[in-house]
Amino acid sequence: MSGGAVAFLLLVAAAAVANAAVTYDHRSLTINGQRRILISGSIHYPRSTPEMWPDLIQKAKDGGLDVIQTYVFWNGHEPVQGQYYFSDRYDLVRFVKLVKQAGLYVNLRIGPYVCAEWNYGGFPVWLKYVPGISFRTDNGPFKAAMQTFVEKIVSMMKSEGLFEWQGGPIILAQVENEYGPMESVMGSGAKSYVDWAAKMAVATNAGVPWIMCKQDDAPDPVINTCNGFYCDDFTPNSKNKPSMWTEAWSGWFTAFGGTVPQRPVEDLAFAVARFIQKGGSFINYYMYHGGTNFDRTAGGPFIATSYDYDAPIDEYGLLRQPKWGHLTNLHKAIKQAETALVAGDPTVQNIGNYEKAYVFRSSSGDCAAFLSNFHTSAAARVAFNGRRYDLPAWSISVLPDCRTAVYNTATVTAASSPAKMNPAGGFTWQSYGEATNSLDETAFTKDGLVEQLSMTWDKSDYLWYTTYVNIDSGEQFLKSGQWPQLTVYSAGHSVQVFVNGQYFGNAYGGYDGPKLTYSGYVKMWQGSNKISILSSAVGLPNVGTHYETWNIGVLGPVTLSGLNEGKRDLSKQKWTYQIGLKGEKLGVHSVSGSSSVEWGGAAGKQPVTWHRAYFNAPAGGAPVALDLGSMGKGQAWVNGHLIGRYWSYKASGNCGGCSYAGTYSEKKCQANCGDASQRWYHVPRSWLNPSGNLVVLLEEFGGDLSGVTLMTRTT
């Protein structure tokens, strides 16, 4: 090949890359030289299985989405420092390639802080114990670890050819996450940290725009974006940046002990149309499919295993109707108006006391209008462009040609199809009692009480605190029968108390306050008495400041009252610690480890007990769940897969009526008051065999096995 031919080919290649570059101006992102209105939806790859991904992505595409948005979960990818994991549910490359195959784009939110109601906000716990570390500030050890991970992800995406300029689907990347509200409390290092993070991200040469959400001072060229229930009042920090909404909350998360929030689709559609009519050009539904907090990935603490989020695609991968259908129709209407929308900024006309018209025109004559009625109860008839239009309360009509109203946010024409849970069989149980008063060779003794996470490193939810109390023969309670009172103060999240192997009760915190106090009378005898406290975590916090200072477990004081001496403080005496449960170490929840212990008949409502049963997969292809509403608190496995924590914690809240009209918040439309926050637990079909499936429950409090049922979900 001649030198001239080579030069020509290089020029063609360079031109192709330049043409494919993702850029932006004040109006929108530009892809392949064209301004775009982009509709996006969050699907987090670890919250579903690889077998579910193609169907979820296709349903998103069918729903009118252009982009799939996902966080990158650091603690899933680097659970041990320097040891990386990118397989199974954490196969990020596979997920991104599936999005490409579907013809959609990707917004990759690398963070690496994610929040997301995810354990420890996505940070690996080992990071807390890096010497000298201070999280999310101008701190050398933290910045070094963060940069290593961000650069690794960018390098991996480049090597796989996954950025848009390489022919891949990634058009955006995000660094940090919702840091703006934290700056004022993070002190002088906050602003320099933000500037460093932005500069570090841009220096990776990812070749796509970087964003920071809820970051009003994001430095150029990083785009600051909005998160919230509504973002139509949001303005970027530069006239050269487009208005982007990275989290349009489609619902809200559920916490154990909390209600199930639901967001009416009429209001969600209204919020999106409000944003578009005010000049917004990128909107992402958080979540479009929420999925499941499998394993122990739920954060909070006290975040439920279900991350359904009232999303258009439900936790099980089924369409939530009419939400999915009504939003799909909205997206079609917006796309019909796209040419006019991207041409420039709207002009605004007052067409009533509460009504306005936002009109977009292109130089070629295209015209689109959004007619809005902000009254929360009264419909309106308005005049626009020589015609009259009826606008329901709290609604927007979309006119892609400035004449024909093809869509109204409050007029739902999509068919409703409520989901049903169908019984598919019961279980025959066997039980194995966890040893509550024995320690093995891994136990260790220290003076005083020690913080839980510093010992478990989150390898287990559980830590035994054990100490001994000597009771003299002269103690008055031995004669009176008025037993002493044990009081335990804990930073969270749940404790169970045993004395001499006998169970005396439990105490636990809640989402609004993880700290707890146990206080109860305990039976003791003359001589040495063994006090065993099982402390359990219910997810690590996912939002806040100074992660390096957070703690859980029994921090004290622990006191014993009602003795001749009055109150005895046990906090500073010797305590013996045992990380995890015996059954965990033996792997009784796994298919191979289940045979390592001797199982007996089904036990009654006993605390800290393992239960197992075998079952056949239900016929057909409908999603599968376990009904654990009759159980107490614990963890559940199927064929060795931890489907998550379960807890029949009764929901408290206000489950009154719900109108779509008026400003929405997560407290407005609630369900499940008085019932368990979560009753059904998703069991992915890909985890099942046709027959001989093993289900194992670790029950902490003592539940009713007779109520546990296999279910299928249909619409």
Swiss-Prot record:
- A single GO CC term, please? vacuole
Give the UniProt keywords, A-Z.
Apoplast, Glycosidase, Hydrolase, Secreted, Signal
Asked if the Swiss-Prot or TrEMBL record annotates the protein with the keyword Transport, the reply is no
| Pfam assignment, any one | BetaGal_gal-bd
Keyword presence, Phosphoprotein:
no
State the signal peptide span.
1-20
- Record GO biological process: galactose catabolic process; plant-type cell wall modification
Q: What is its EC number?
A: 3.2.1.23
The top EC class is: hydrolase
Q: What GO molecular-function term can you cite, just one?
A: beta-galactosidase activity
Q: Which family is it part of?
A: Belongs to the glycosyl hydrolase 35 family.
Among PANTHER family, the record links this protein to: BETA-GALACTOSIDASE RELATED
**What is the name of the protein in this document?**
Beta-galactosidase 9
* Organism per entry: Oryza sativa subsp. japonica (Rice)
